[in-house]
């Protein structure tokens, strides 16, 4: 449940979402739920100038392991072989709740994904991960470039979390608050 559930090689620009309530099970955000690839080829997607204001984005859970994963303000999840660039976007006065990989701008980027976030801001937003990987800008990422971004929101994760053995790929960010 997002404005765009899944996108592949998209250009999305200058959208504003205000006073929305978005709920679902995973790969969830106000703008794009998941940025995907087709047939394993490398794909590029651009999200620019999008704003999410005074909204609630939260996952539901019915006991499935993937419930509550990859919840973000602008994008939920980035699949393998995807290059995502988020530029000049902001999330303001929102509440974002999930279990794993919850971020103010991006929830999570999977192994072999590459995300670049520039000139984007999380302002006065409460980000909560009930299990792990909560971040003001990004919850979890494989290859990540962040430039000229800021977070002045509240970030809350579980009191005690551990990284599962063997599940941390090289060049990853895990349980880091940006």
Where are these regions (language model features)?
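Predominantly extracellular beta-rich ligand-binding scaffolds that present long acidic/polar faces
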Residues: 1-178
